From Swiss-Prot:
PANTHER family tied to this protein: PHOSPHATIDYLINOSITOL GLYCAN, CLASS C (PTHR12982), PHOSPHATIDYLINOSITOL N-ACETYLGLUCOSAMINYLTRANSFERASE SUBUNIT C (PTHR12982:SF0)
Record-given protein name: Phosphatidylinositol N-acetylglucosaminyltransferase subunit C
Family: Belongs to the PIGC family.
Quaternary context: Component of the glycosylphosphatidylinositol-N-acetylglucosaminyltransferase (GPI-GnT) complex composed at least by PIGA, PIGC, PIGH, PIGP, PIGQ, PIGY and DPM2. Interacts with PIGQ. Interacts with the heterodimer PIGA:PIGH.
InterPro entries reported for this sequence: Plno_GlcNAc_GPI2
Functional description taken from the UniProt entry: Part of the glycosylphosphatidylinositol-N-acetylglucosaminyltransferase (GPI-GnT) complex that catalyzes the transfer of N-acetylglucosamine from UDP-N-acetylglucosamine to phosphatidylinositol and participates in the first step of GPI biosynthesis.
SS bond list: none
Single Gene Ontology BP annotation: GPI anchor biosynthetic process
Superkingdom assignment: Eukaryota
Species in which this protein is naturally found: Bos taurus (Bovine)
Alphabetic keyword roster: Endoplasmic reticulum, GPI-anchor biosynthesis, Membrane, Transmembrane, Transmembrane helix
Residues spanning the membrane: 67-87, 88-108, 153-173, 239-259
Keyword Disulfide bond appears in the UniProt entry: no
Amino acid sequence: MCAQPVANTKEVRWQKVLYERQPFPDNYVDRRFLEELRKNIYARKYQYWAVVFESSVVIQQLCSVCVFVVIWWYMDEGLLAPQWLFGTGLASSLIGYVLFDFIDGGEGRKKSGRTRWADLKSALVFITFTYGFSPVLKTLTESVSTDTIYAMAVFMLLGHLIFFDYGANAAIVSSTLSLNMAIFASVCLASRLPRSLHAFIMVTFAIQIFALWPMLQKKLKACTPRSYVGVTLLFAFSALGGLLSISAVGAILFALLLISISCLCPFYLIRLQLFKENIHGPWDEAEIKEDLSRFLS
């Protein structure tokens, strides 16, 4: 009579269910318990040079901030004429506009329905209003101490780098917030320049380097990757050269930062990928594959 339950236990096949009573102890583990275990089935295999290429977006934005600060310092010290900066920026914007339109082939213009004349009018309206409000921008923060202005500018530029759209699908990404923080930093720094003309040109330059330049970067990266790499290298060396003219120590530290982001970080990412171990099985939460947007409208 005592051996009968044991025989039944061997004959009954264990099932992975909780709604049936089974002749097994609560801590029983069957051989088939982990037969559906899968590891790293959705893991992406990264290649070193591909990661280096993607890191160039971060390099570009760091260099943009560096160039902006260097240009501001040159204008504040009286080493750069505002007329020269305005002319150079205007010519660069025109070249970038033509290059963007050439690479894009007019597809973006067709989708948006905008014409070249509409773009020209928008540019003229922006320049006119910015020039008209430049005296206000110059005197906007007169009652605020210079140290506070510099601290605000630093925090705004850091926020710009944090919230910038580097191509990642993350909740923290906000292109609008990133651009607004960069413009706010430019207004803060422009208010400490000698004249209203300096403030006007500084804000205009901020729009060019923080709003227009990233658009051309993305287009070059998507359509002409080799040209994009060349532009990134040229831009990085230009930023380093400008920073070197101000501070050798700062240029060395900035160069180490760029090398770490573009070379060391991808290397460690590839190395750490060997230790990645995500497990998947029947215990995973159910995923709804069907598009439910029609029920939400």
